[in-house]
Amino acid sequence: MHQKPVTWCYKSGAGTAPVYYHPWPLRASRRELAGVTPRRQIPPVRLVRSLPLGYLFLLLVAAPAPLPAIIRRPSQALLERLLGESYHPDLRWADLADVGPDLRQLYASRGWGAVWYDNDTLTGPARSLIRVLAEAGNRGLDPTDYDAGWLVAAAALPGNADSVFEARVDLGLSVAAARLVRALRFGRVSPEAVHAAFHLPVDSLNVPALLDSLAGTPQPNDLLRSLEPPFIHYWLLMATLVRYRELARDSALVNLPVMPAHLRPGQSYPGIPTLRRLLRLLGDYRDSTPIPILDTVYAGEAVQGVKRFQMRQGFTPDGVIGDATRERLGHPFDQRIRQMELTMERWRWMPRRFPTPPILVNIPAFRLYAFETLSLREDSMLAMNVVVGTAYETETPVFTDELEYLIFAPYWDVTPTIAEKEIRPAALKDPAFLTRNRYELVKDGEPVSPWPEYIEGIGHGVRVRQIPGAHNALGRVKFIMPNDYQVYLHDTPARNMFERTRRDASHGCIRLGDPFALARFLLRDQPEWTEERIRAAMDAAEPITVRFRAPVPVYLTYATVMARPNGDVFFYPDIYGHDRTLDRLLRVGYPYPRSAAAPPPMPVASP
């Protein structure tokens, strides 16, 4: 009687010698998992003996060469079955709908053979990739999204893999790799799930080809870096994140004692030595001499260190440790680490290439950056303070557009909302209001006198505009990017706003701290527009329109952390609550939300 083939398996326990056993109880389940149906087997010797001699002769002489037997391993059938069902039972996020089509293409091109195993052993590239997945936190990602713990444990098992186990680990690693490359290239959450107006073109990504390349390289980071944002701000933030994770592990050494409600310079506080150590860890205490243990007076470099810390947090740097500063000092790492993770996610939404050097407006930082080169390096950019829309009232939307032209000495065409709700009541109460504030009424495209019947008609066929001049709400120049929100960049006569630390005070538009510098920067490729001509145009009595040689991309972004090349890290308040929204969506886990959020109100009242 024919004997069934025997498979011997390896088993080991702590402190015991390896034991090899025959897995008959698992035999049926493995065939079931692999989709293999057992058949009645006929011993080859009995089959040959049953054939007539003539048939044997024909078999020997008629066939020029024997056909190779097609042997389908159980692991191949299991891979095909799991991908066909788009489900992997060992993974935390078992539904493979997000990566299934790409992985079916990958495995089909390999005849459903293993990607990460060779001779039943994990390859070197596979082990390198598993280490990268385990360190995904250094990229601001969550290693559990990629089942890193399960893969690390699988890679640590001794001996060669059972074919069914091999198939499951192989597919699990492919799933993790596919999810990782997508997260690095596009981010996990769709930007439109947080900002409905933030529409970006989606590049194609050949995931099967990327995984095929990863399977052949022992240095996966080299390939993965090519998917990540090429901008220096992203990489500085990644290095800062790694440093803050290390500091968080040591932060127990710098827990501050109970502090008074307001600690002011010159006061005594027993926790001053600890405060100095904490500020030194954060890079804000610049005195390299040993910290005096007995000095408990809040003065000198300790005060300067607190001021630097406050400035990096977006606070007024007055050196007084009140509620807000004390709260930040009490949680200096964990909350800041999460801010970095959220900001890195936002950087991954950005395009990898720009047609021309862009302008970035970071809303919570109240800063504008106009770049001269495509590398986005700080040594070739123009930076200035800005005023943005008021939180929870007239917020500046997060979106992208292109600057097409500027207007020197512009009119301000008052939006219908402001005209009807603010200007009309004021003009009805005070007939001199319009003249005093340099407003004029326009009907059917022509200016009309500020008579009562026309004032009554404001919002009903009568428009309001403010004539050019230094008093104009748009200042002496505005920069136009046509959009549905009526948001643009402009000058402002209210220069005192730029003295504030927190500058969300507009109706939604971006007020510029140095509009002349931006005009000169954007017209640098038009030599006829000299500094003298630009200043004269800004003081003109009538509007002057100048188109740019090429549209300039503008990104109104929302990053609550910025790292600088000198090692400084600046944290900004979540003024619109967008970080809270993104944090909530990321905590959902796979599948991350990809649908659009509710659109912001439009149009935004300007300026």
Tell me the role of every PLM-derived stretch.
Residues 52-62:
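Bacterial N-terminal signal peptides
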